[in-house]
Amino acid sequence: MRFTKHNLFLFFLVVVLVVSIEAHIGEYDEIWRKRAQQAKKAARHAYHPNPKIVANHLNNQVDKAIRGSNSRRRDLHRYSGKCMATNPIDQCWRCDPNWARNRMKLTDCVLGFGRKTTGGKGGKIYVVKDNSDKDLVNPKPGTLRHAVIQPEPLWIIFAKNMVIRLSEELIMTSNKTIDARGRQVHIAHGGGLMLQFIHNVIISNLHIHDVKAGSGGLIRDSVKHYGYRSKSDGDGISIFGSTNVWVDHVSMSNCQDGLIDAVEASTAITISNCHFTKHNEVNYLQIPSLKFPLETKSLIFVLKLLQVMLFGASDSSSGDSIMQITLAFNHFGQGLRQRMPRVRWGFVHAVNNDYTHWLMYAIGGSMHPTILSQGNRFIAPPNANAKEVTKRDYAPESVWKNWVWKSQGDLMMNGAFFVESGNPKHAFLKGPDMINSKPGSFVSSLTRFSGSLNCIEGKPC
């Protein structure tokens, strides 16, 4: 086959995509096969057959929170305005001065598709005292890696502010909460978090940034098992075949690959109150040494587009049809290029998020995903060619016009526009049982405290 610059680029882009959906498992042994089977069963159990019910419940809670905000503001006046919780998740816990004494109350607060997530509730408190990550096979007690591999439910907190540079990706086990409230904890300059074939995980109040691809090697993934891992991608949080996951009040930026990926039939996920920034650089991958025609010898790097969020990694992974994800009260801020998220196959409810900057587009997809966009604010960039919120890939209009992409109550600013598709009478938008979201004009308030919080124990947060 004679390579041209064009088909060479496409070839290596395909290679990149294939590599990105591998599990990074060097030896797919009986332990991993069993975990994968259990994960598929958990995903089927977590899938909600009527996602409209979940969307309605969240929208109803937002409405109640806003209708009660006036009385709450009067109450807060007595506290000199030191606490203002502007959405229902935050109102559930933030203004309680005793939140640190009852950390597990946080599990009562989750909304959306991840609403049944309880993390380490009912388990012991594990205090991380050591920010080192030197031994990947026998992690040191008191480190984050030692905490997340324990077999029992754990509520993981931190003794002090710390920066944790993970030597390789952090492979978690089920029934864990990583709760950094009250501390400034950064996962930075090393590996990211890997949730692979697990369930019931809460990640709260972390800073995750400057995550790098790992080299792989022998890594312990449970108390009783370790094995060889291949090179990791450099995602901040990778959700791979996992269910009942809640990511809340996390600040993320500048990871080598994606900020958050959810793939391989991951479902029952809520991402809320997060702040995403500075993820628009382009990575280049060096082409292996091959004999090319003369005209392609100078082409030694290929472009790898970065994604803020990738939900579904392959057009061939039809198992991602089970994917259901809620994005609520997040701020997609400065320095983001595209893919907020980029969706294949599954269902995404994006509600009351603030999209204040993008360079190419905000929401994209392929393989007929279902997208319900409600009450978001979209502020388009100055570039006249990047005003469209949406982008469909690898399908002509004759095909994508049947995909269900709906916008309701979104606020479009600076020329932004959302191209809808699908039946205009789709059940999402019709019927007496439909509860509308609060419109996009409420977003600046609902997302006001997105990102990691500066909480102090003994005081409202």
PLM region spans:
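Cleavable N-terminal signal peptides of Sec/SRP-targeted secreted and luminal proteins
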Residues: 5-23
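Extracellular beta-rich repeat passengers
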Residues: 27-97, 298, 342-461
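Acidic Gly/Asp/Thr-rich repetitive segments characteristic of extracellular carbohydrate-active
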Residues: 107-156
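Acidic glycine-/aspartate-rich tracts in secreted/extracellular proteins
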Residues: 132-133, 161-162, 183-184
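Extracellular beta-strand-rich solenoid/capping regions of secreted or surface-exposed proteins
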Residues: 140-152, 163-177, 187-204, 210-242
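Right-handed parallel beta-helix
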Residues: 175, 180-183, 199-210, 225-226, ...
